Amino acid sequence: DKYIDNIGPGTVTFLSDSDRFVVKNETRTGFSHLYMYSMEKGFLYPLTAGEWEVRSLVCATDDKVWFLSNETSPLRNNFYVVGTDGKGKRRLTRGDGIHAIAPSQGCKYYISYFSNSSTPNTVTLHDGRGKLLRTLEENAALKEYIAGMDYPVKEFFTFPVTRDGRRIELNCYIVKPADFDPGKSYPVLFTQYSGPASQQVLDRWSVDWEDALVQQGYLVVCMDPRGTGGRGEWFKKLTYGQMGLLETEDQIDLARYVAGLPYVDASRLGIYGWSYGGFMSLNCILKGADVYRMAISVAPVTSWRYYDSVYTERVNGLPQQNPDGYDIPSPVYYADRLQGRLLLMHGSADDNV
């Protein structure tokens, strides 16, 4: 059983002849790819293929299609162009990291916003063939400032788990203080979201409050558990009908692994999350009371029965048909297991959670 993804603006794109159209679909091969169809003849041929994902279709003309994909790594994306005959696929961007694209009509020109974990945003103007025309913003002053302060950088790693006899590598990162000493013992904050099809472990530039903790001597760790995005339909839809169960298992297993590292103070592990991440941090401190000493839960879902149906029923099915999928992951039923310290935060004007 699998849930059906949301339909977005780039799911179906018609060409000017009003007969051919490009469909972004993941159910044919298990990975999100582009396919050419005809109103008259139906399916024609694939435009892209492989064990990687097209993240978005940026624009299309009668002879070319431009798209973003994570072909090089689930942690990164790049901008590509391919002919509408499925031939001549070519990568237009060069930097390894995360690219966002703002195209002109017909992709005659485009603006690229690029960053990675060690490089702040760079904004450049290109023609539709990828040729650099102008650098609009290089953030030179910020880069110079960071170079002089030993700014901590994400270290990416994978955490292996074996589920139902299958080995799965989960993407993670750790941020250490600039003066990290492996002979010392550090407290750890796990930060995560963990929601369906989401990704937090990405090679992109970001500065947040967790970085202030790193400067105060904390380690910050993040993982994308089973059910998150960028790795194909099978991986993403493992959590169908059981939101919160597999993700909690993975997060607790990672925390137990990190607790055993020689430079970690196992008595000072905490977890943070907001919205779905808040739901997860509650589950983790209740079901992983032996490893977490603290949790921060902001705007959490505490029962899927009371969250909006347009989101919940798509991923979890109907409550009448799947009562266990609604109740077993609910932290309300495990509240008596709380041992550590819990900071619960919620806005009084929140019209969502």
Give residue ranges: language-model regions:
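Multi-bladed beta-propeller domains
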Residues: 1-11, 25-26, 37-61, 70-72, ...
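Serine-hydrolase catalytic core recognition
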Residues: 100-353
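Hydrophobic residues embedded in beta-strands of well-ordered beta-sheets
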Residues: 21, 44, 65, 89, ...
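Short glycine/serine/proline-enriched coil/turn segments at secondary-structure junctions
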Residues: 3-5, 28-29, 72-74, 117, ...
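Structural motif
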Residues: 30-35, 74-80, 118-125
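Blade-terminus and WD-like Trp-Asp/Gly-His loop motifs, strongest in beta-propeller folds
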Residues: 12-20, 58-63, 101-109, 117
